[in-house]
Amino acid sequence: MKRRFVRVISSAVAALSVVAVANAPQAAAYNTLGCKWSHSGISFYVPSPYISYPYWSNAAASWGGLDGRILWNTRPADFTGLNESRGNTVSWTGVTRALGTVQSFPPCSGGHWVSGQMEVVLNWTLVSGYSSSKIQGVAAHEIGHAFGLAHNTASTGILMYPYDSRTVSGPASDDKAGVNALY
Ligand SMILES: [Zn+2]
């Protein structure tokens, strides 16, 4: 189970991630990871020198107005954001992972994530060729994972669609419904 979650959450472009969600019902166009925060005000911090900073900022704002809310640039942080240049050594353009790992799932205790032990990352090598809105879409997608949402392949118009060919740069109504169901 844990290994499957690792694949779902970490492989933005891997075929395995589609296989992992293929058996999930698609009627409600959101899926959940099986872990979430124990509170609805979720603090997120990104150091301002990072080149990814404006994308994380805009992506966090795009998730506003929900029952589960991102408290942007608040410390101590439940999760942090950064960018790395990993070239093609990984398949992901963005990842949500345990702090300091390449792509391991964050620790989950009693159905809740452990504050401070999660980070969201943009692989700058791959996203630097993207448009600004597409980069923001990858960032917002990772924040969706950080809420507790899993991939959903029902439509390219869903933010949690697993590939960067998604047609939205922020949460759609189905994505928001998923977060409101979680918190
Ligand atoms: Zn993803």
Regions found by a protein language model. Name each.
Residues M1-W37:
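N-terminal prepro-regions of secreted/extracellular proteins
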Residues A22-Y183:
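Zinc-dependent metalloendopeptidases
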